[in-house]
Design a protein with these regions (language model features):
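Active-site-adjacent mobile loop/cap segments within catalytic or ligand-binding domains
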Residues: 114, 121-129, 166-224
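Bacterial N-terminal signal peptides that target proteins for export
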Residues: 1-8
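A short, glycine/acidic-enriched catalytic loop
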Residues: 46-60, 125-150
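Mature extracellular/periplasmic domains of secretome proteins
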Residues: 101-117, 140-141, 172-178
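Bacterial N-terminal signal peptides
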Residues: 8-17
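Active-site histidine-acidic residue metal-binding/catalytic motifs
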Residues: 25-107
């Protein structure tokens, strides 16, 4: 996916990924390995979908949005020196397993095997209450809380006027991951307004910039 510069993303770009050449040359993520996990999109060996993810009005699929956002985040982090590994890609958009829970464990195990410094899961939310909206960041192990705070704070700054559902501790983030791990719900597909936003490439790029900014800020602080 080709990243498109939008006016909404300019403040983040100028404050982090551009700026003075000497600052950009520092590459704060040098030596850092990150696993990005765009959620869902699992089939069994027979080719049947067993984890489709949420959907919005007009057929918008969570799995597609998560993948596009993650593939926009990846080069931003690589530009800062990180090695980025994706659990699925545009060329290989589907994963295969016998259950959704087993596949989720497999994604975390991948992060363990590559000795990732952070495991970042990208999702969109869904709720029976169509009025429910906003972004939420989840963590499980307490050592993951600083990463959750950094990414969530960046999203709050990037999304003025959007509902902030806060940072929450939930075991579904990953009990298997042995490094800081978070799950980011970028917005709510079942909400009419946010569902439309999440389907817009400009908004997806804006979200990607915010997540990337939060990750960079986390590692900058962890090195001090």
């Amino acid at each position: 996916m080709r990243f498109r510069l939008t006016f909404a993303a300019l403040p983040l770009l100028s404050g982090l990924f551009l700026g003075h050449p000497a600052v950009a040359a520092e590459k704060p993520l040098e030596g850092i390995t990150l696993v990005l996990d765009p959620g869902h999109a699992v089939k069994n060996d027979a080719g049947k979908i067993i984890n489709a993810g949420a959907y919005g009005r007009g057929g918008t699929q969570e799995r597609d949005i998560a993948l596009k956002v993650a593939e926009t985040i990846a080069p931003l982090l690589e530009a800062q020196g990180a090695k980025v590994i994706m659990t699925r890609t545009r060329d290989n958009p589907w994963r295969y397993g016998y259950s959704a829970s087993a596949d989720n464990r497999g994604r975390a195990i991948l992060a363990n095997l590559v000795r990732a410094d952070a495991y970042i899961r990208i999702h969109c939310d869904w709720n029976r209450d169509k009025r429910f909206k906003g972004h939420t960041t989840f963590f499980y192990r307490w050592g993951s809380r600083p990463l959750a705070e950094a990414v969530h704070d960046a999203l709050v700054r990037a999304l003025p006027g959007h509902r902030d559902n806060g940072i929450k501790r939930r075991s579904f983030v990953s009990v298997s991951a042995q490094m800081p791990a978070i799950l980011v719900e970028l917005g709510v597909l079942s909400n009419r307004v946010e569902g439309k936003e999440l389907a817009q490439e400009s908004h997806e790029s804006h979200l990607a910039m915010a997540v990337a900014e939060g990750v960079v800020e986390y590692f900058k602080k962890s090195k001090t």
